[in-house]
Regions:
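TRNA-recognition modules of translation machinery and tRNA-sensing kinases, especially anticodon-binding
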Residues: 1-229
Length: 229
């Protein structure tokens, strides 16, 4: 989350800094020059009007090993690895959060993560791709977008689709990476990013009313699932 320009003591990190690895507890090192650049972004900003968060970055805290809480961490690693421009990168990431288990939430789930970068990329490009995912993958009939806030994107948006029984349901969040994210990773062109709940997309596509049923051991139930996903 440090590479995503989320302050180390920000309340938004409460759902991310939860599942800590017991052994080893810390990474041996963090690759340079990315560590120095990320520290600079947090403490003083990246220039061009960016002032950072104005606190002293704790490198030892950054080395703590935690289970991934969202797939955007994979996107940051892809950018740091020397992403091509223009380029498109996608992944399916298993994530872990301390959520109250109910019909639409689980403590571990899968996210479809994507980034697209290029000189001509903009917010309209992002909305078009999100709409395509919702209609072609989740097979949603109704889609809507709502303004959102994430520390690492600006502007940001949430995508919701209508489930036949549960009503409007959030599929995930998206936005344009802030310069404080892309500059330390060596990227100078716009980058759009999104993380969508694959399990929830399957719920809509398969007509399932409870996310726990996706992992049911009831073979009769599995055989009666409609369609393919």
């Amino acid at each position: 989350m440090d590479a995503l320009f989320m302050p180390q003591f920000h309340p938004a990190r409460d759902i991310h800094d939860v599942y800590f690895v017991k052994e080893p507890t810390h990474a041996r090192s963090i690759a340079e020059p990315y560590l120095t650049r990320v520290v600079q972004a947090h403490e003083k900003g990246t220039g061009a009007g960016s002032t950072g968060w104005g606190y002293q970055f704790d490198v030892e805290r950054a080395k703590r090993l935690v289970l991934r809480s969202q797939g955007t961490a994979v996107s940051a690693r892809a950018l740091a690895g020397g992403a091509s421009v223009p380029g498109k990168y996608f992944s399916i990431a298993r994530c872990f959060r301390y959520d109250q288990v109910d019909a639409t939430h689980a403590t571990d789930f899968f996210q479809v993560e994507g980034i697209v970068l290029g000189a001509d990329i903009n917010f309209r490009t992002l909305l078009g791709l999100l709409n395509l995912f919702a209609r072609e993958v989740a097979q949603a009939k109704e889609v809507k977008f709502l303004p959102a806030y994430f520390p690492f994107t600006e502007p940001s948006v949430e995508m919701h689709v209508r489930h036949p029984k549960l009503g409007w349901m959030e599929l995930g969040g998206a936005g344009l990476f802030r310069p404080e994210v892309t500059t330390p990773l060596g990227v100078s062109v716009p980058v759009i990013a999104w993380g969508l709940g694959l399990d929830r997309m399957a719920m809509v596509a398969l007509g399932i009313h409870d996310i726990r049923d996706l992992f049911s051991a009831d073979l009769d139930f599995v055989r009666t699932m409609r369609g393919n996903f």
